[in-house]
Structure formats: C-alpha cells, structure tokens
C-alpha cells in the first residue's frame, strides 16, 4: 500500500488535513497553513494520488482518493481530524465523510458541490500533454508553449508550478495527466 506524500507544518495536537484541487498540490496551501499552524493546528499538506510528489496510479476515483486519505491517517495514527477539501479535494472529503465519518472531527468543502460536473478541463490537459520536454529547458519556454491552450497567464503559472527537474537539464510534470 502506498502512502500519500505530505508536508507537515506545525507541532500542535489538532490535526488539519488540506486536500488540494485538480491539477494542484498540497504546497499550494503552504502560506495559509503557516497561519493555521500559528493558531494551534498541525497542518498536513497532502498531495493526492497522481498529483505533486505522491504516487501515480491508473486507479482514480473519489472513493479511491478517500481511501488514500484513510490509509494516510492510519499510517500517521491520526483520528478525529479536521479537513479542508478544495474542489477535487472537496469531493474527496465528501466521500471520506461517507466512508469513515468516525475519522472526522469537522470538515469544510470549498469551491465544489455534491453533484456531477460537465468535464471542462480538457483544454488544459491537452496543453499539458503537448509539452515536449526534450525541447523545453525552462518555465518561460513551457509557458510560451502552453499559451495557445491556456490564455490566462495566472492559470498557466498555477499549472506550471507542477514543473520540476527530473535530472539536471531535464524537466517533467508532477502530474499524471494520462489518468
């Protein structure tokens, strides 16, 4: 069983898990997590599967994402946690509330509702899929190649936070966009 990657901030006894949105990662919440840590929370910035530094898998559903969080909590011996789930993380949180309500002290679901949404990220995924890292050597080049697919610069910069150096001179994405 693989355990989700996390960055843990703070040393308090109240456990707060942050679940990021689609195409994001836990570190998107780093600034706010420091504030929450300063008021008594130990904050777990989790990268959900196929995102950030967590493992990649062809299995991907909200039930599976919720089971990943249960496994994470078991591994870290966490119980009665607070959870903030944003967008995709909110859907994960709703599933977690059904699968393991005893695990939750309280939760917040942000920026999403319990309904089925029309897929609307295909243009972003197409843009990310066409990035040829044999031709791209820096973030600016990646942004330029992504711009026909993602017009908004802020959105491009958000997506390109997923760039990382696989090895010196070789970039890659911390996203499993195939799934």
Tell where the protein language model's regions lie, with residue ranges:
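Serine-hydrolase catalytic-loop signature spanning alpha/beta hydrolases and amidase-signature enzymes
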Residues: 23-31, 43
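Active-site glycine-rich loops that stabilize anionic/oxyanionic intermediates
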Residues: 13, 21-24, 87
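Conserved alpha/beta-hydrolase catalytic His-Asp/Glu region
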Residues: 134-179
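Active-site loop/oxyanion-hole signature of alpha/beta-hydrolase fold enzymes
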Residues: 33-38, 42-84, 88
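Alpha/beta-hydrolase fold catalytic core
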Residues: 1-17, 38-41, 78-79
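Alpha/beta-hydrolase active-site loop signature
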Residues: 23, 48-52, 114
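Flexible "cap/lid" loop of the alpha/beta hydrolase fold
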Residues: 94-99, 103-137
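Structural cue for short, hydrophobic secondary-structure segments
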Residues: 18-21, 45
